[in-house]
Curated annotation (Swiss-Prot):
Any one biological process term the GO annotation gives: tyrosyl-tRNA aminoacylation
GO cellular component: cytosol
Function as written in the Swiss-Prot or TrEMBL entry: Catalyzes the attachment of tyrosine to tRNA(Tyr) in a two-step reaction: tyrosine is first activated by ATP to form Tyr-AMP and then transferred to the acceptor end of tRNA(Tyr).
Lineage, broadest ranks: Bacteria, Pseudomonadati, Pseudomonadota, Alphaproteobacteria, Rhodobacterales
Name this polypeptide is given: Tyrosine--tRNA ligase
A Pfam family reported for this protein in Swiss-Prot or TrEMBL: tRNA-synt_1b
Positions of short motif 'KMSKS' region: 237-241
Amino acid sequence: MTYHPKSDFLRVMQERGYLADCTDMQALDEAMSKGVVPAYIGYDATAASLHVGHLLNIMMLRWLQKTGHKPITLMGGGTTKVGDPSFRSEERPLLTPEKIDANIAGMKQVFARYLDYSDGATGALMLNNAEWLDSLNYLDFLRDIGRHFSVNRMLSFESVKSRLDREQSLSFLEFNYMILQAYDFLELFRRYGCRLQMGGSDQWGNIVNGIDLTRRVLEGEIFGLTSPLLTTSDGRKMGKSAGGAVWLSGEMLAPYDFWQFWRNTTDADVGRFLKLYTELPVEECDRLGALQGAEINGAKIRLANEVTTLLHGREAAEAAEATARAVFEQGGVGGALEVVEIAPATLGEGLSVTHFLVAAGLVTSGKEAKRLVAENGLRFNNEPVSDANAPVTAAMIGDELKVSIGRKKHKLVRLA
């Protein structure tokens, strides 16, 4: 029998499709109905920005704040030095402290678009677990914390078991990650009264570890809530495109390309993505998602505009839509297309189309460039390119050259 929560937050989670599992739905619902519940999600600083795969959990934090609770974004300045083994096929490379700090700075810019970090009962907090992990005494930690963990139980977690079943190495360093993440929850409860940890369903084992530890050490009533691991209707992992990660940083991915990612959503995913990634009413999401034929394209544009507005602002969303119309409907050039610069010295007397595409970073290899040309997938200023060895010169580029790769990827190349 489905439980129907009375608290606004859990009702939104259930209605919009954010909810996979909860350790004690009724008790959490009761707590959230009575007052402000601080809740956190942890983010290891393994990249210079977050990507679309993180966006579902960021939206959960946004809804948490909108429904009267306190979101905590926990930066893994400490745990990133160890690495999360969850469902990894191999050990992560270790990062320097300087690189970790730089990554955290990039991630902060993204969170500030979605959460209000001002003072107040529901003002968001941004914390770094290096605050308590960097100063730990190892022997004290083993005695006071390590004794509460069963290695047998930790080996049964699917994230660990899958590595061992493939006979792949799981280092002691990574194995300790689970204990450190559990300790985060204990410290957040002790220092900030945090009572809820959220995350993707692959984090269930880590979340339960933290709950068990906090109950044993501090006898705290705390909870865990997970979201589904999202894939598209055709089975692709959310957050990836043919060109790689879909970054949430405007410096790593142009707002136009971000907008275009959402515009290219598969028909079957439109309604679901509107519920998860926008704040439109559920009824409107259902109506738009049910459209068919040519009408579904309007729903995709609405999705792209709403998601891009949340991250980059209304002006960027409108510019992206205008550029898309110019590029696709009129065959022109829009102002929001990403600009790629190439030095005249690189071109010399002229580069072949193949070498030009690689030098400009438009493809990853000469083989890919030749395949594009062979499959009629390359156009310069809307004209098909049929010879992969034809020269590209500075004079040919002129003020700018519009390069179209396939039907959906367009760049402007200018001389540096």
